[in-house]
Amino acid sequence: MTAATENRTVRRNGPGTKRADWNNWSPLAFEEMDSALNIQQYIQQTIKANPADVATILTPPLDQDEGVWKYEHLRQFCIELNGLALLLQRECIPETCQQMTATEQWIFLCAAHKNPNECPAIDYTRHTLDGAATLLNSNKYFPSRVNIKEISISKLGSVARRVYRIFSHAFFHHRKLFDEFENETHLCKRFTTYVSKYNLMQQEHLIVPILPNQQQQQQTTVQ
């Protein structure tokens, strides 16, 4: 058995794999990743190494196509956001969160309906993540994860804006759950850094004060 074959065999979670051993394999250099999904593999490996190291996670390998890099990160954000959605189910129920809101001036309409409509926050969260998964896995817009057309890349901004609302609702209405999730994953910090780096959202829409400059600005406003 060659070393390459051994790597391909070991880097799988077989039937009956214990939780402690799940994905518990040695890291690979990006150049050694021969999978067609090497960018996803690289991103997930970097997150696993240290989820708090946002700068390293968002730094692409040399000569990496920017469109593919942005696309794969957004897919990964949506995957991880399911963890926050699961936590929110503890207390974010239609009876208490009848609308998808953040601060008092923000009420978000759900695009999953025939006509955009108000939705209970937990339903909005589910609909948004389902819609994002459908778009990002669409053969029409993303037939390849190796070469992505610019017209398809333009869709990423609308996905980013919608999924960010999940963070903002959790922060302003379920702060304890938000902090529990963020302290473990640093996902909102990574997402905010990502959309700022690639100009996928306007700064005034980034209302969760998660980055140092946002926190400083909030303190100045309060004073």
From Swiss-Prot:
Its domain of life reads: Eukaryota
- What UniProt keywords apply to this chain's record, in alphabetical order? Cytoplasm, Golgi apparatus, Membrane, Metal-binding, Transport, Zinc
Q: At which positions is Zn(2+) bound? A: C92, C97, H169, H174
Classify the protein's membrane topology as the record does.
Peripheral membrane protein
Q: Where is it located?
A: Cytoplasm, Perinuclear region; Membrane; Golgi apparatus, Golgi stack membrane
Cite a GO CC annotation: perinuclear region of cytoplasm
Q: Which GO terms describe its molecular function?
A: metal ion binding
Location of region: Disordered = 1-23
Which Pfam families does the UniProt record give? Mob1_phocein (PF03637)
Q: What does this protein do?
A: May play a role in membrane trafficking, specifically in membrane budding reactions.
Q: Tell me which family the UniProt entry assigns to this protein.
A: Belongs to the MOB1/phocein family.
Q: Which PANTHER family match?
A: MPS ONE BINDER KINASE ACTIVATOR-LIKE MOB (PTHR22599)
The protein depicted here goes by the name MOB-like protein phocein
- Source organism per entry reads Caenorhabditis elegans
Q: What is the lineage of its organism?
A: Eukaryota, Metazoa, Ecdysozoa, Nematoda, Chromadorea
